[in-house]
């Protein structure tokens, strides 16, 4: 016999439902980040120690844009150093902040940093980005020059130099032949013998990787960020296919 649709339905509080879910989840071998006690309202247990913040290793910020923040105040779009993350922050004290200025990452004039996607940058910030990256490369030239001195074949048909804008297979082969074993000690040497603007080409490649996170070979990770994550010198973990 079919039950009446008006029959009463038992209701359960959220803690009971959560406890049941956790029991079922664990019975199937699952693991969760929090147990039911952690999720109870009003829990007075001691919080776990916070891990390192994502931008703890950053020392400076290059201001790409200062813009009004609704309903009031300002925020900045920045490029961090040395890892070259795109970040934003609330402005506590505008002072002399302007496009192109460089400040310490832990400066009190800014609030906490948060990452921003390239597509969410303001038009002004996007226009400043390449020059800001060139500035970062120039400040830490040895790290970035390593690309020109150690780049190898990515595959049987493609050399890493071909990741740079405008560099084709013939030009890449020419650069490899010029480099030989000794390599270069400064960017100016690369420019003179190869007829390129080595810093700008590298900066433009970095911008492309920021625009498109799906790039399979990311020089930003290989050259810049791997050391920040692992403490290993750049290039020691970059093994390209020859």
Feature map (PLM): residue ranges:
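C-terminal extensions
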Residues: 3, 31, 140-163, 177-242
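Small-residue hinge/turn detector
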Residues: 168-169
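Conserved hydrophobic/aromatic packing and binding residues within compact polymer-binding modules
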Residues: 172-175
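Structure-specific DNA junction-binding interface
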Residues: 1-139, 233-242
